[in-house]
Amino acid sequence: MAGKKGSSPNVYAYFKVDGDKVSRIKKVCSRCGKGTYMSEHKDRNTCGKCGLTEFKQ
């Protein structure tokens, strides 16, 4: 049986590293919780899992 290949390089697009600190770039969905990020559009943030939409002011 083949082993796991490792993590996807696309995961690193969600985080920013500044020295010793790691911060999230995208907003976390308030309904789904940790691990689910919201997509950023021109006028709103949308969760692809539950469909929650937060409009920007």
Curated annotation (Swiss-Prot):
GO terms for molecular function: structural constituent of ribosome; zinc ion binding. GO terms for cellular component: ribonucleoprotein complex; ribosome. InterPro entries: Ribosomal_eS31, Ribosomal_eS31_arc, Ribosomal_zn-bd. Keywords: Metal-binding, Ribonucleoprotein, Ribosomal protein, Zinc, Zinc-finger. Belongs to the eukaryotic ribosomal protein eS31 family. This is Small ribosomal subunit protein eS31. Part of the 30S ribosomal subunit. Zn(2+) binds at C29, C32, C47, C50. One of its GO terms (biological process) is translation. The keyword Hydrolase does not apply. Binds 1 zinc ion per subunit. The lineage of its organism: Archaea, Nitrososphaerota, Nitrososphaeria, Nitrosopumilales, Nitrosopumilaceae. It comes from Nitrosopumilus maritimus (strain SCM1). It comes from the Archaea. A zinc finger (C4-type) spans 29-50. SUPFAM superfamilies: Zn-binding ribosomal proteins. Its cofactor is Zn(2+). Pfam families: Ribosomal_S27 (PF01599).
